[in-house]
């Protein structure tokens, strides 16, 4: 459970309970690398591939690609479906009030997952899965080609500057929007017990 849920369940909540704290590490931004966090979707919710591609054209330029698409800039996405790759380029100007709305994961969620595929909450929807951008794109391809999933999206990584803007505004990053490296496999945690 998240801290907020635990507070609601704990009628004697004081604020100094363990669930109010988490481990953290500090490092310079030039020592941190953020990779994309790719998406896999199990089905097209009854749509044919041709119908899905046509619906995408409302908000994206859909470009047939002869090779795997690993986006080179913000607001462009790779789509792998039916053994073919497409480059999707978002066609709208963003007039945003909060920085989290400009993130590629937010655009994908709003215009494709919610807008076309009826995936409203990526945290809980059983039809979506995630794969770190640190893994080879062939891993996505094999999951789609083996019919575990119907389609896959590759995303341009969230920048450190975007992450900082979201934090500075007091917002929360959307789920599965960043994959950080380095990961800390082992370490020493110190916790004062009174």
Predicted segments — roles?
Residues 1-194:
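Surface-exposed, charge/polar-rich loops and edge strands
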């Amino acid at each position: 459970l998240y801290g907020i849920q635990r507070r609601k369940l704990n009628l004697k909540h004081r604020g100094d309970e363990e669930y109010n704290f988490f481990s953290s590490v500090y490092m310079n931004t030039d020592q941190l690398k953020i990779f994309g966090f790719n998406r896999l979707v199990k089905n097209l919710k009854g749509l044919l591939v041709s119908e899905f591609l046509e619906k995408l054209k409302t908000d994206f330029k859909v470009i047939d690609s002869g090779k795997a698409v690993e986006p080179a800039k913000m607001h462009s996405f790779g789509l792998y479906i039916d053994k073919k790759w497409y480059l999707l380029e978002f066609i709208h100007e963003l007039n945003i009030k909060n920085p989290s709305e400009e993130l590629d994961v937010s655009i994908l969620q709003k215009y494709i997952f919610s807008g076309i595929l009826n995936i409203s909450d990526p945290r809980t929807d059983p039809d979506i899965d995630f794969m770190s951008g640190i893994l080879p794109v062939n891993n996505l391809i094999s999951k789609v080609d083996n019919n575990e999933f119907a389609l896959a999206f590759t995303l341009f990584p969230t920048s450190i500057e975007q992450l900082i803007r979201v934090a500075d505004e007091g917002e929360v990053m959307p789920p599965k929007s960043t994959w950080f490296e380095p990961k800390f496999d082992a370490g020493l945690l110190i916790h004062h017990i009174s």
